């Protein structure tokens, strides 16, 4: 590793956006440089700011986001950056089913494989359930229904994807069994991210409290037009083809339903 690469590595360690400049992702045109949307930059900044000592009370995040806006890519980049530059850390990716969690882990492994060699750490375990680096940091994929795998364990970064789609009883059990361990640590971070899916669910309750500053979660709402091609014409087409309620929930990120 030369001096230039060492300096780049130092900058990447301090700034997740700097790290993201070296990320390549698979697109319809093949492997391409990651070009973040404005909201993706803001989310990466928010997540990483929560790691600072002065932000100890605002480390946890809850995000509502529209379909197919690139939120999974952000989860993958942030989790990978966290693992590479923080030794001896444990990361868990949780979703409503194991296959969904594995898909995110696959994306993380994909990004990892395409990093420049001077940034990419050696992996001691690399399969569809766990990725572990030589710095002793690792990430596992779990389903919400099997959170016994992480119950009582000290997870440094827990990311729950499509949290609103987890079965209500599974999500409630997750909160009761995992959240107390996380909440007792000032250095642990939890990120809940999802498209809304009704109001009779713990995810909605956490969101409602977050926007009223009644819990430790920092709320972020991603708008339907956060993706450049999503304009009024696109909106009208989606409503025409799928209906107003579909658009409001899946893209305008409204919580629709009744108790």
Task: Locate the predicted segments by residue.
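Short, flexible loop motifs at catalytic/binding sites
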Residues: 1-259
């Amino acid at each position: 590793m030369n001096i230039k690469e060492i300096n780049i590595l130092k900058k990447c360690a301090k700034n997740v956006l700097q790290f993201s400049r070296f990320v390549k992702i698979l697109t319809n045109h093949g492997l391409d440089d990651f070009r973040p949307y404005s909201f993706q930059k803001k989310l990466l900044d928010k997540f990483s700011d929560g790691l600072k000592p002065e932000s100890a009370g605002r480390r946890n995040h809850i995000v509502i986001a529209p379909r197919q806006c690139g939120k999974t890519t952000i989860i993958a980049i942030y989790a990978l950056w966290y693992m590479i530059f923080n030794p001896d850390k444990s990361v868990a990716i949780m979703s409503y089913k194991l296959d969904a969690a594995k898909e995110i882990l696959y994306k993380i492994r994909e990004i990892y494989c395409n990093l420049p060699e001077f940034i990419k750490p050696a992996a001691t375990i690399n399969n569809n359930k766990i990725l572990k680096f030589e710095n002793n940091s690792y990430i596992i994929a779990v389903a919400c229904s099997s959170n016994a795998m992480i119950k009582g364990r000290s997870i440094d970064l827990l990311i729950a994807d499509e949290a609103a789609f987890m079965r209500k009883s599974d999500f409630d059990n997750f909160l009761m069994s995992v959240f107390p361990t996380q909440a007792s640590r000032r250095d642990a971070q939890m990120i809940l991210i999802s498209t809304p899916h009704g109001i009779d669910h713990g995810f909605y309750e956490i969101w409602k409290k977050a926007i009223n500053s009644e819990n430790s979660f920092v709320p972020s709402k991603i708008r339907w037009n956060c993706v450049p091609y999503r304009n009024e014409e696109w909106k009208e087409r989606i409503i025409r083809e799928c209906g107003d309620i579909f658009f409001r929930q899946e893209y305008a990120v409204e919580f629709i339903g009744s108790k």
